[in-house]
Amino acid sequence: MKKFLLGLCILGLTNLISAQNDLAMATANDNDITIKTSKIKNELYVMSNSNETKQLAVRIKKLQKIAAAYDISKESIYSNNKSVTYDVVFEANGNYIKAVYDHNGEIIKSEEYYEDVRIPYDLTSQLAKDYPGWSFNKSNCKIFYSKEEASKFTYTIVLKKGNKSKLITR
C-alpha cells in the first residue's frame, strides 16, 4: 500500500514538472543601435544649476528646454548685420520665461516665474520642522539666470493653519 501511494505521488509530480513555462530572452545587437544626439546651443542655461535642477518640477524643466532649444535666427526680426539682443517670452499655463538672447542665439539672462510648483524636498522638510502643524497652501518659484552668475532661486510659499496664513520666502 505504501508503494502504491508513493507511486501515485511521483506520478502526480511528473505532470507538474512539465507544466512550467519556458523562459525566452531577446537581446539586441549593440552595433545596430544608432543614437541621434544634437547639441543644444544653450546647454549652459539648462545645466547651469545642476544641483537645483535635480529637484526642479518637470514642467519647469520642460519650459526651460523649450527656451534653450529656441533658434532666434529663424525669426523674421533676426538681423545678421547687427549685434543686438532679443527679448523672447515663453508662456505655458500661467508660467513664463522672459529670456534675452544675444546675436549668436545664446541666452544672456532670463527671468522665470512658475505657479503652484512642487517644492524641493530639502525646503519642504525644513519648513515642516520650522512650522509644525502648518499645511502648504500655495507655492511660487522665481528663477533668475545670468550667463555670468549662478542662478538664483526664490520660493514663495503660503502656509495655512486654521484661519491663519503665513507667507514664507526662501
Describe each model-derived feature in a short phrase.
Residues M1-M25:
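Bacterial Sec-dependent N-terminal signal peptides
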Residues D102, T169-R170:
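Short, solvent-exposed loop/turn and secondary-structure capping segments
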Residues A99-N137:
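Long, charged/polar, surface-exposed segments that mediate recognition or autoinhibition
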Residues W134-K138, I143-K147:
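Gly/Ser-centered flexible loop/linker motifs
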Residues V58-A99, F144, E148-L167:
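Exposed beta-strand-loop-beta-strand "reactive/processing" segments of non-cytosolic proteins
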Residues I40-L44, H103-E106, N163-K164:
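Short coil turn/linker residues within repeat-based beta-strand modules
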Residues L16-Y78:
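Sec-dependent signal peptide cleavage junction
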